[in-house]
């Protein structure tokens, strides 16, 4: 059989690339005799730009390394040597159809989102596929980001209805996607499943080699930040915890950080979290990788474009699944201020150790649930 994995990949986002890799690994393990590939398709050009704000010559050199490492990862680990960027929806669907897949797994990541479509567009993205594509189609931890039924136009509702009814399995990653699909099919047909990266083992040799080669020593008491350049509260929060004896690490160039780690490959970054006491991040997969490495995340939602009208987001859904809500998330834009971050970080540092055992069990159950859904899809 020929099996395609339709997903996001190829930008400079560690989580995006690792979820694609985790999906590829899991599907190949269950189809050892079949031709399994990540479909070499983008509906838009992936962002692959260096960090220019607060850049130094050294940070630009590390960024250049990061870009090269991501190119290598795409080729060696995802098996993609040529990208096909097809913005036109009909042309994209034709491209996928002509590859003659027997099975297509759609997911993970937010590829079911509709806010990348042009303003006023009443179509749905090619990632939803269409009834014309006759392969067996399975949603595999897919997310619609912030798409809500009430925001859809009548043509979009009709097209989504036809697309969803063509899926053999409906495995979704968050409550927002579950709620959207429940307008089209019975809730019993939809299954909430974890992100594929829960099933991906961590090989620490990648980050160990990187740190040794670059002579980087990360002290035990370290707090990492993965933030936007416009997050003005960072410097005050960093200064507060530096005074308390913490080393400040940043995954992007930042004048207030003691150590900058912007040159990591996806597999290097996957293992770096274990060197921190805590990470402050706006990234969904940072949160997962922190938990997998046994450290505390404080996740924040940067603006309302990432949430529904009810305040749900992929990050809040994840934090709730681990019974870490509300302490481990700041999802109110009015609380994106230094004092709120300082209060939360101090509270988390004082309480997280008592939760580690439960978190470890939850991570194992997440991996089993994801792989269990995949196994079930083989027989459905």
Descriptions of predicted regions:
Residues 1-380:
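Active-site anion-handling motifs in enzyme catalytic cores
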């Amino acid at each position: 059989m020929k099996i395609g994995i339709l997903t996001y990949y190829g930008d400079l986002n560690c989580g995006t690339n690792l979820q694609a890799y985790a999906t590829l690994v899991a599907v190949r393990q269950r189809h050892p005799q079949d031709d399994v590939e990540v479909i070499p398709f983008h509906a838009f050009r992936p962002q692959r730009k260096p960090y220019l704000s607060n850049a130094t010559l050294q940070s630009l050199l590390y960024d250049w390394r990061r870009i090269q490492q991501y190119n290598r990862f795409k080729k060696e680990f995802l098996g993609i040597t040529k990208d096909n960027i097809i913005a036109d929806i009909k042309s994209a669907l034709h491209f996928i159809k002509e590859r003659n897949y027997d099975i297509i797994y759609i997911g993970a990541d937010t590829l079911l989102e509709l806010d990348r479509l042009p303003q006023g567009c009443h179509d749905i993205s090619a990632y939803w596929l269409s009834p014309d594509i006759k392969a067996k189609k399975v949603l595999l931890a897919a997310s619609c980001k912030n798409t809500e039924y009430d925001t859809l136009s009548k043509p979009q509702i009709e097209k989504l209805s036809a697309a969803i009814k063509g899926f053999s399995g409906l495995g979704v990653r968050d409550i927002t996607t579950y709620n959207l699909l429940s307008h089209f099919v019975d809730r019993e047909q939809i299954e909430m499943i974890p992100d594929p990266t829960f099933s991906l083992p961590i090989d620490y040799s990648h980050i160990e080699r990187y740190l040794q080669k670059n002579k980087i020593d990360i002290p035990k008491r370290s707090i990492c930040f993965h933030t936007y350049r416009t997050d003005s509260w960072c410097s005050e929060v960093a200064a507060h915890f530096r005074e308390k004896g913490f080393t400040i690490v940043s995954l992007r160039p930042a004048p207030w950080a003691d150590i900058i780690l912007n040159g990591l490959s996806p597999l290097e970054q996957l293992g770096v979290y274990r060197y921190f006491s805590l990470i402050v991040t706006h990234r969904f997969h940072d949160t997962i990788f922190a938990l997998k490495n046994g450290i505390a995340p404080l996740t924040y939602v940067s603006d309302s474009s990432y949430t529904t009208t009810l305040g749900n987001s992929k990050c809040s859904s994840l934090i709730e699944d681990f019974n870490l809500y509300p302490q481990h998330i700041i999802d109110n834009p009015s609380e994106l201020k230094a004092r709120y971050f300082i209060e939360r970080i101090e509270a988390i540092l004082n309480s997280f150790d008592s939760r580690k055992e439960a978190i470890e069990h939850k991570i194992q159950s997440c991996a089993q649930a994801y792989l269990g859904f995949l196994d079930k899809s083989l027989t459905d």
